[in-house]
Amino acid sequence: MNSQFQARQIKQIWQRGVARRQFLKWGLGGVAAATAIAAGGFALLRRSPHDELPTPDWVTGLSAAEYHLFDRARVVLLPVEGTPLVDSEAVPVVANVQTTLSYLDPATRKELGAGLSLFDNVVVFSHGCRFVDLEDAQARALFDRWGEGSVLQRTLTTVIKQLVYSAYWQEPVTWPPTEFDGPVSEKWGLEYLGNAPMPQQPTIDVEQEQA
């Protein structure tokens, strides 16, 4: 699955799950709450050791906070220890996420960026630290809870999971342990035709129907 196709999928999930007006109401409200935390006595809680860590030189389409969020999500969502699966550390997961997000239109990318910031910061209320600083079990439990939460929570969880999973599995190095030998569309040289329209019912001429 190429990054452009995946970007279209992400945009559709985002737009279906969170209408623009709802996002402005919920998302910006949540960001405002997180900002209030930073301005108040809990400012120290929002700080993270990750804030002091440098990002790789190739990180140009993600903020530092987004890079650390997806790098943490990679570890949390792809626990392969004790399995024959390839360690996500050996796969350019976050780089692939960056590529996918680069195909989003500016408005959707901006909204999603605010949503990612909300996801990282809002757990300060319940855990006293950001998502990137949660223990693995806590972070997985957060994904489980948000997966059954509000529309905004479910949408953000779905988007993050799909970005991380697709970024991992699109790399051929991850396929051999599952005995997957690649998409048949590539092996057979099939051209991607985009989203085909649904078949239409044939129209019946009124005179023909009366006859």
Model segments located where?
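N-terminal export leaders
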Residues: 18-45, 135
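N-terminal secretory signal peptides
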Residues: 1-18
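Flexible, low-complexity segments enriched for small/polar residues
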Residues: 56-58, 63-170
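Short hydrophobic/aromatic segments of transmembrane alpha-helices and their interfaces
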Residues: 6-7, 51-52, 121-123
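Ser/Thr/Pro/Gly-rich low-complexity linker/stalk segments immediately outside membranes or between
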Residues: 44-59
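Short, contiguous, pocket-lining structural segments
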Residues: 15, 19, 32, 61-65
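Long, amphipathic alpha-helical surface segments
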Residues: 150-211
